[in-house]
Curated annotation (Swiss-Prot):
It is a multi-pass membrane protein. It is an enzyme of class 7 (translocase). It comes from Salmonella typhimurium (strain LT2 / SGSC1412 / ATCC 700720). Residues 120, 313-321, 720-728, 795-803, 856-870 are extracellular. One of its GO terms (cellular component) is intracellular membrane-bounded organelle. Signal peptide: none annotated. The chain crosses the membrane at residues 99-119, 121-141, 292-312, 322-339, 700-719, 729-748, 771-794, 804-822, 836-855, 871-890. The active site is at D377 (4-aspartylphosphate intermediate). This is Magnesium-transporting ATPase, P-type 1. Induction: Induced by low levels of proline and by osmotic shock. The leader of mgtA mRNA functions as a riboswitch, favoring transcription under low Mg(2+) conditions. Under limiting proline levels the MgtL peptide encoded within the mgtA leader cannot be translated, thereby favoring the transcription of the mgtA ORF. Induction by osmotic shock also depends on translational regulation by MgtL. Induced by low extracellular levels of Mg(2+). Mg(2+) binds at E335, D645, D649, N713, N738, D742. Gene3D superfamilies: Calcium-transporting ATPase, cytoplasmic domain N, Calcium-transporting ATPase, cytoplasmic transduction domain A, Calcium-transporting ATPase, transmembrane domain, HAD superfamily/HAD-like. It catalyses: Mg(2+)(out) + ATP + H2O = Mg(2+)(in) + ADP + phosphate + H(+).
Amino acid sequence: MLKIITRQLFARLNRHLPYRLVHRDPLPGAQTAVNATIPPSLSERCLKVAAMEQETLWRVFDTHPEGLNAAEVTRAREKHGENRLPAQKPSPWWVHLWVCYRNPFNILLTILGGISYATEDLFAAGVIALMVGISTLLNFVQEARSTKAADALKAMVSNTATVLRVINENGENAWLELPIDQLVPGDIIKLAAGDMIPADLRIIQARDLFVAQASLTGESLPVEKVAATREPRQNNPLECDTLCFMGTNVVSGTAQAVVMATGAGTWFGQLAGRVSEQDNEQNAFQKGISRVSMLLIRFMLVMAPVVLIINGYTKGDWWEAALFALSVAVGLTPEMLPMIVTSTLARGAVKLSKQKVIVKHLDAIQNFGAMDILCTDKTGTLTQDKIVLENHTDISGKPSEHVLHCAWLNSHYQTGLKNLLDTAVLEGVDETAARQLSGRWQKIDEIPFDFERRRMSVVVAEDSNVHQLVCKGALQEILNVCTQVRHNGDIVPLDDNMLRRVKRVTDTLNRQGLRVVAVATKYLPAREGDYQRIDESDLILEGYIAFLDPPKETTAPALKALKASGITVKILTGDSELVAAKVCHEVGLDAGDVIIGSDIEGLSDDALAALAARTTLFARLTPMHKERIVTLLKREGHVVGFMGDGINDAPALRAADIGISVDGAVDIAREAADIILLEKSLMVLEEGVIEGRRTFSNMLKYIKMTASSNFGNVFSVLVASAFLPFLPMLPLHLLIQNLLYDVSQVAIPFDNVDEEQIQKPQRWNPADLGRFMVFFGPISSIFDILTFCLMWWVFHANTPETQTLFQSGWFVVGLLSQTLIVHMIRTRRLPFIQSRAAWPLMAMTLLVMVVGVSLPFSPLASYLQLQALPLSYFPWLIAILVGYMTLTQLVKGFYSRRYGWQ
């Protein structure tokens, strides 16, 4: 029974945390594993559109091949709305206010308030109502601010689509980069490798277009999409080869398409409107919050009944005992936790944005601080984001203009995703030569790049009788489809001797830190029709183009800073192991034994996990290799970050605890990431890690303070309840004490953090929290018991008639010691001298202490059932507080030496 109640309470707590802020959004479509019903009308409409001729498409969608003009766009948007999913639309303010109220802590307070009102204790009911109001409003305001900050940050890195629009009254059109929420049905858009499908589309032109639909269909392999259907009698819209759906992504190829549905009208939009709850795997932050919350709630559920039984049995007044036990339960619940978490994360996100780090999901900040392994690609991270074409040689290593011109034709005429290598090739040919080449050779066709083949081809023609296929790509993949080489002007077979020559030349280039790309050609009789991958066979190896990818000046100090921060950096690259090892050496990273992709193919998960733990450099990896390595490192208990910006990085970005990409990354990589860097630099990343640790430390302060003081208070209550003939403190006193303490905690997100607390990864550790409670909780109990003795024997408050004096004395000691513990526990150093809190926290705690001491002397004292304390009480109060702080400091020194300090 206890387990069921605990689970239900925690479920309510977890729902209370701002879901959209501390849960990573699944890729659009990823949640459709939940069975949901699609309206038959939508399926029928999709099937009709899939089979339509282009002329019919223009008519049905009120569009035309030139694109929509401004007036047509306005009409379409008025009819269909913005291209946003239902779940992305903000809820009304009153819904947010209700969500902020309905947490187990406020419900407990409300029950207690109702009981107080029913027993005509109106003042207590008013105080409880004030507590509920403050807790709810603070959380509401902080969540609203956090939501606004998160939305503003997300808007800075929103995805775009390439759209054909009419741009003036003369009917001139142009391809424009527009945010995807501006798309309307009838728009014509262009797709390329790496693009997210921004709406439901009907393909009108396609070139080797392959789309990953696993998020919708579960099919792991990409499927080809075409402009004219090959299966006219298809019954399942998701299997129609002329349709693409929102939430899927382009793996390879290019296309043009007409937008047939946006927002709620899309296939995924219909699913999102019908799916109310999805199972989301918790990341490291969410698991930590879950474990800590469960620990505190279980402690509350165990101790409150114990307090009830002891007080009811010893005092005989079970009704009063029940009220007191319920007040103790309220005092044991960390009702400010949601607000502290939300405001701390939001403040960290805003600070990071000023350091060129955009946080898409607020919990990523804490994961930043917890990260102990960073896996990253080499290009643009360790190296400069500018690649220089250094050599263009034949197979013997001699400079060759012919090889350069072949590479230029390939880079110039390909329409897929142009990378830094293509840019370097295009810049490596002067304008005169480029004009001559483009005038002499006409493009016939292309075979786009994909990560399975790791090469791409264009087909060009100089005359009408012969076509030339020009292929460039990774050396081994090019060699796999070559049977001949061009050697000293002659075409000779690619035999073992030639292969050894090729390896010798390319290894020499690799050792110089040059990245080698092979170039091959093939002459074919002119023909009609498309060229396919099968045509990439029996090629002639022409030579190589070699690129210099020099390390950044900031890489070495950034790696040193990351190492000093307790983060292990691992390089996961698709590049050659020789090039990667050279770069690692130049930046001071000890690569050790290098593991290549083919080495891990046959390894079991356990063997690869052990290998991954001790290996720094992995080379020649596929996207699935990267994902598998990241997943296994997580399985071993590490908090893993992955930094990448390409299509091949998306699976690993998604698998990591924290996915990190850059503003210039492809759509699918940015969508999969939790954090976007406006500057692709490890130094910026290191600053983010430090901010994450500051954020975590401030959150942990609240939990440690609350847990330890609550533990001590309960122990004190149990002792007092067992031996006193009256309640040690009235339920109302506990509530006021709790309210004042909560007010003092509001400033924790603004507190300073000691340098030593941000020098290593910070992890949630419920076991450490339990140990912390056991060590520090009894300290307050010791001085509470001394206070009991003081009030009983020195001030003779030992009868029911003098219980108000007793309760007033413990009220002041309890509140001041509970407030001072904030300063004692926030640092492992000597508080106020070696480490001072930020001024907001100093001011709030001082204010609460002044209010606490003043209440027994105020006009409210009689209403609160407190009384003025004699002046002789205050020297004893100072002695108790000094003794309390001294013992806490001594225990803190022992604890930090024995167990460390978070």
